[in-house]
């Protein structure tokens, strides 16, 4: 049986990236909460590229 996590950069960014968050009201709420909390990384788009 294969594992449930099959990583894909493109899928990850499209689902959890900054533009995806900004596209919906709920997503903007997430960003607002993370900013209020002082997160250095708001979305997966803010990650340092490992290559």
Swiss-Prot record:
Taxonomy, superkingdom: Bacteria
Any one cellular-component term (Gene Ontology): ribonucleoprotein complex
GO molecular-function term, one example from the UniProt record: structural constituent of ribosome
Entries under Pfam families matching the protein: Ribosomal_L34
Keyword annotations from UniProtKB, A to Z: Ribonucleoprotein, Ribosomal protein
Example of a GO biological process term: translation
Gene3D superfamilies per the UniProt record, alphabetical: 1.10.287.3980
PROSITE patterns with a match to the protein in the record: RIBOSOMAL_L34 (PS00784)
Family that this chain belongs to: Belongs to the bacterial ribosomal protein bL34 family.
Protein's name according to its UniProt entry: Large ribosomal subunit protein bL34
């Amino acid at each position: 049986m294969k594992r449930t996590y099959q990583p894909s950069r493109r899928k990850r960014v499209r689902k959890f990236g900054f533009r995806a968050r900004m596209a919906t009201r709920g997503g903007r709420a997430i960003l607002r909460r993370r900013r209020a909390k002082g997160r250095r990384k708001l979305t997966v788009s803010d990650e340092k590229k490992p290559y």
